[in-house]
From Swiss-Prot:
It comes from Lysinibacillus sphaericus (strain C3-41). HAMAP family: Lgt (MF_01147). The gene is lgt. It comes from the Bacteria. PANTHER family: PHOSPHATIDYLGLYCEROL--PROLIPOPROTEIN DIACYLGLYCERYL TRANSFERASE, PROLIPOPROTEIN DIACYLGLYCERYL TRANSFERASE. This is Phosphatidylglycerol--prolipoprotein diacylglyceryl transferase. PROSITE patterns: LGT. Its EC number is 2.5.1.145.
Length: 273
């Protein structure tokens, strides 16, 4: 049987003439599940019931816009020649780091307006962010994007992957199978989610769950990015995601060390104020 016939169609279904892509469905599913989990913890930690929903009404669209701006700016040579494609986000091309920057800035401004500690909210939201990223990476899988370098089919079989994943990792235009880097990052984030949920019970200083997320995600992204073939570059061989990841690690570690030394007495995660 033709291998291409076994691959997943990136279009899930049609609403009349409008194609609904798996990519969009998975992104939306990730946001919804992240909200449900985050909302439960937010109320438990004493935030108003509508706080997280109000924040997401601003953070989600701003994050998507920032993610697209980040991606387009890194490939401006292409988009300056094809401006009509700038809005085609349904075909992929949104950068997670751009989305995170947009979300963090929005959350910081929102919490300042509401007179709520940003780090309190960031700690609550950190596991939910990972949930969104875990699911969102499968949108890349459906679109056959964000993959790594060539590998043999035997390599993928040795990873004990099911056939439907192996088949999707065959890229027709390359004529080869590729590293499922989307899966590596999704699994890395799943491990990170488990770690953060454990850290919640330790009752760390305020901000340390969020900074731990920043460190964990950045370490994984740095190494996995080095395997990808579609990286966005800043200058020469410098990959933008790796540079941002280094910054994330430094900021996360630096913030934990600084606050442990300078912020006394420190608020704890379980302090509902």
């Amino acid at each position: 049987m033709d291998l291409l016939l076994l691959q997943i169609n990136p279009i899930a279904f049609h609403l009349g003439p409008i194609p609904v892509r798996w990519y969009g469905l998975l992104i939306v599913s990730g946001i919804i599940l992240a909200y449900v989990v985050g909302q439960r913890e937010a109320v438990k930690r004493g935030l108003p019931e509508d706080f997280l929903a109000d924040l997401l009404l601003w953070a989600v669209p701003i994050s998507i816009i920032c993610a697209r701006i980040y991606y387009v700016s890194m490939r401006w040579d292409y988009y300056s020649e094809n401006p009509g494609k700038i809005i085609e986000i349904w075909n992929g091309g949104i950068a997670i780091h751009g989305a995170l920057i947009g979300a963090f800035v929005t959350a910081y401004i929102f919490t300042r307006i509401k007179n709520v500690s940003f780090l309190r909210v960031a700690d609550i939201a950190a596991p939910s962010i990972l949930i969104g990223q875990i699911i969102g990476r499968w949108g890349n899988f459906m679109n056959q994007e964000a993959y790594g370098g060539p590998v043999s089919k035997e390599f993928l079989e040795n990873l004990m992957l099911p056939d439907w994943i192996i088949n999707q990792m065959y890229i027709e235009e390359l004529g080869t199978y590729v590293h499922p880097t989307f899966l590596y990052e999704s699994v890395w984030n799943l491990i990170g989610l488990i770690i953060l949920l454990i850290l919640r019970k330790v009752n760390l200083n305020r901000g340390e769950i969020f900074f731990s997320y920043l460190i964990w995600y950045s370490i994984g992204r740095f190494y996995i990015e080095g395997m990808r073939t579609d990286s966005l570059y800043l200058v020469g061989d410098l990959r933008s995601a790796q540079i941002v990841s280094i910054i994330g690690i430094v900021v996360g570690l630096g913030a934990i060390i600084y606050r442990r030394i300078k912020v006394k007495p420190a608020m704890k995660y379980l302090d509902n104020k």
